Amino acid sequence: MTIRFVSVVGSDTGLLDAAIAHYRGLGVEFFHVIRHIESFDDPEFERAQDVLMRYGLAFAAVHQGPWDEDLNAYLIRAQMRRHPSDWWVVADLDEFHVYGRPLTDIITACEVGGYDYVMGALLDRVAADGTLPRLNPATSIWAQYALAGLVTLRVVRAVTSKVTLARGDVHLHLGQHGALTGRSLPATEAFAQVHHFKWTDSVLPRLTQRVQAYSSGDWHLTYPATIVGSRRMLKYLEANGGRIDVTAAKLALRRCGSDYADYEPWTDLVPTLLKLRSYAAAADQPGRPAPTRSVAG
């Protein structure tokens, strides 16, 4: 079996080094990292190239142009369809998958059972004091963001289900929240934790930019839930002094390392997360697969 990784990287590349190391540790052989830039003057472009070079890698493609909600799906689909029989780990740069058993065992279970993809759900990582600290490359991200819990589900109230692993010929919903083709491996076999390292110092300016760009019309708004969730999170942070309230019971924040068993409430949460899975495709996405237009690179 061949295991590939695909992700689209924008201007916020602080997690790139940690992501490559993490997924290599899971057994990924080939990395298809796509760089999206609006201008080649992007100061992070060379830094991201340098990170890849340290691992003997290069960008699979560089796409220059304005961002829109469908872009990541276009770029990811263009890579996956080149190797339709291989297995692809699909993740945003701030998403670190954790499984309860080796990836090769999970893929074998899929191939033996005739399954085409694996599901999981977001588990947000938060600093112990609830602040939004800057990434420190000298310290493990698991230690910097030592708590795990349900910020996206309970505050943003966004869809948290994710396709984490899929054959290259599977058609994914935008955002990888589900799939329109293929069969899902039962959650009893594998249900991935998607550790979500979003809550850093860059999140506030990114959320603010998103709301402003959508409100002004600079970005075309296809999915209204996107801006609603961003506004909700900004309002929450303002009300809490720029922090996440780590004492709030509804967020279920717990000390958590990098092992699947570290987050104690997970087993009890999975049934609830599975109930939300069908909602992901029906409500968060308008029932369409990732587009398949041609993308150079």
Model-derived segments and their meaning:
Residues 1-24:
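N-proximal low-complexity "stem/linker" segments adjacent to membrane-targeting elements
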Residues 2-3, 24-35, 57-58:
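Short loop->beta transition adjacent to catalytic acidic/histidine clusters or analogous donor-positioning motifs
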Residues 9, 34-37:
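Short beta-strand/turn micro-motifs composed of small residues
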Residues 29-30, 86, 116:
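Short acidic/polar active-site loop segments enriched in Thr and Asp
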Residues 36-91, 98:
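Active-site-proximal specificity loops/subdomain of glycosyltransferases
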Residues 72-74, 99-297:
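Catalytic-site signature of metal-activated, phosphate-bearing donor transferases
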